[in-house]
Amino acid sequence: MPAEIIVIGTSTGGLKALQTLLCSLPASFPLPIVVVQHRGKASDDGLSEFLGDFSCLPVSEPEDKQPILPGYVYLAPRDYHLLIQNCSFALSTDPPEAFARPSIDVLFQSAADEFQERTIGVILTGANRDGARGLAAIKSRGGLTIVENPETAVCGELPAAAIQRLAPDWIVPLHEIAPLLLKLTEVQGAERPAAPEGAELARHYGS
């Protein structure tokens, strides 16, 4: 079945990674993209505006019970878990998971429960293991899984943990993820493309 949602999880180095990814997606991109970027309680409220400067797609922090719309980028608010329920968002102040709130695992698990095999999960650079369990849940439901190559990530711990937990469909450098997403959404229901090849990213990005 064609994909209906993309969920992305990242931590250390994630802002630069998200800039690189979002600036490579056109305004016509057809799916909603939901992002968990680990950040502290005192982080800047303007993160969605900051990322919006690099994106052709509108970027915002969703409110509780807000419907999910195609062609938007949704960023988990600081200090809230972001879940998907009945094609809408739900915000939770449940305790942190893997020392994180928002938690990648929480978002990914809820997306897998809601959209099943119509989910694409993406793990980018990061410094802990949050997201590995959630990505495994997406794969177990028949969804597609993409992990940034730990060798080219700013911080390889998070992608490496995901690879240890499951066998992702693709392990690729950061700059190849956006083209892969375009291929996966351009011809819906088509045969899965092979992992693209290309030069590795330099290790110069920071959060």
Across the structure, where does each feature detected by a protein language model lie?
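Conserved acid/base catalytic micro-environments in cytosolic active-site loops
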Residues: 1-207
